[in-house]
Amino acid sequence: MAEFIRAQIFGTTFEITSRYSDLQPVGMGAFGLVCSAKDQLTNQNVAIKKIMKPFSTPVLAKRTYRELKLLKHLRHENVISLSDIFISPLEDIYFVTELLGTDLHRLLTSRPLEKQFIQYFLYQIMRGLKYVHSAGVVHRDLKPSNILVNENCDLKICDFGLARIQDPQMTGYVSTRYYRAPEIMLTWQKYDVEVDIWSAGCIFAEMLEGKPLFPGKDHVNQFSIITELLGTPPDDVINTIASENTLRFVKSLPKRERQPLKNKFKNADSSAVDLLERMLVFDPKKRITATEALSHEYLAPYHDPTDEPVAEEKFDWSFNDADLPVDTWKIMMYSEILDYHNVEASGQMMFQEDVPPQ
């Protein structure tokens, strides 16, 4: 039985195994508090996220189960990875992941980025999205604050399919709305991986300009700002809007022509503007894919088709439509945690068997 240590962080009890020391608050993550800590087993710094009251409602239990399944399944250099998971005596769940020093939001608010950093960051975002999309996973909430970066400029995407709780400590917190694809904003019938490409385009534009591209005050204002730059959506896109109220609103907007992005991004080179033009397209079907973006000339300095892997298998979403009681989600969660530790233990045993005797 693991030994647990208690600490008070922001008035919240953190119960962690004795494997971890030196807890420091980092902020609020998706429905949980995040601390940095020292992993005494590996001597690495890690991030520990406490999922608060994961079994209080079926919705929370399902959301926690989904995050656990995603963290277990997604294994890629540009995606945050799980290094440990445990349930405390108080039945809170703790996810342990690698710790990166900062995020793109903090970088963008501190100083302008040079071209080679913009290219390298965008390359890594697209490399991560190629893998994630190949697994049948859509991020849905891509924004600078959930793109983590370390001192070597290695980049990892975090918080998949989850809404991040606003951190009260973070001044000038950027709204998710700025990066949201029009098909989500206007509740079109169906959306898919293309929403992440739109968000990545907004992030790319912000790296180029140093400020958000579409800083809407609300959804109506947001859509209006988008049409000022990209013009009125084409009729075949407008006709896919299911809600009559939304349809009426879009049709009431003045007709606008798409503005050439080179007029707005005067300091960016032509290949950057060309890639951005292909990402910020109203029709999701005509938006560039992550795989295509990796082959674009703007990312040529980093593109290596032999080192841009796809997922070995699709993520199993079969649980996502399930409407189950808390106790069932709890049993399923315990099973996943046991499976994770069994796989980790067998991997370590195999590694030990491979090590030749001294």
Swiss-Prot record:
GO terms for cellular component: cytoplasm; nucleus. It comes from the Eukaryota. Disulfide bonds: none annotated. The modification Phosphotyrosine is found at Y173. Dually phosphorylated on Thr-171 and Tyr-173, which activates the enzyme. Phosphorylation is induced by fungicides and osmotic stress. This is Mitogen-activated protein kinase hog-1. The TXY motif contains the threonine and tyrosine residues whose phosphorylation activates the MAP kinases. InterPro entries: Kinase-like_dom_sf, MAP_kinase, MAP_kinase_CS, MAPK_p38-like, MAPK_Sty1/Hog1, Prot_kinase_dom, Protein_kinase_ATP_BS, Ser/Thr_kinase_AS. GO terms for molecular function: ATP binding; MAP kinase activity; protein serine kinase activity; protein serine/threonine kinase activity. ATP binds at V26, G27, M28, G29, A30, F31, G32, L33, V34, K49. The modification Phosphothreonine is found at T171. SUPFAM superfamilies: Protein kinase-like (PK-like) (SSF56112). PROSITE patterns: MAPK, PROTEIN_KINASE_ATP, PROTEIN_KINASE_DOM, PROTEIN_KINASE_ST. GO terms for biological process: cellular response to oxidative stress; osmosensory signaling pathway; stress-activated MAPK cascade. A motif (TXY) lies at residues 171-173. It holds the Pfam family Pkinase. Proline-directed serine/threonine-protein kinase involved in a signal transduction pathway that is activated by changes in the osmolarity of the extracellular environment. Controls osmotic regulation of transcription of target genes. Involved in ion flux-mediated turgor regulation. Belongs to the protein kinase superfamily. Ser/Thr protein kinase family. MAP kinase subfamily. HOG1 sub-subfamily. Its cofactor is Mg(2+). It catalyses: L-seryl-[protein] + ATP = O-phospho-L-seryl-[protein] + ADP + H(+); L-threonyl-[protein] + ATP = O-phospho-L-threonyl-[protein] + ADP + H(+). Activated by tyrosine and threonine phosphorylation. Residues 20-299 form the Protein kinase domain. Its EC number is 2.7.11.24. It is found in: Cytoplasm; Nucleus. Keywords: Activator, ATP-binding, Cytoplasm, Kinase, Nucleotide-binding, Nucleus, Phosphoprotein, Serine/threonine-protein kinase, Transcription, Transcription regulation, Transferase. The active site is at D141 (proton acceptor).
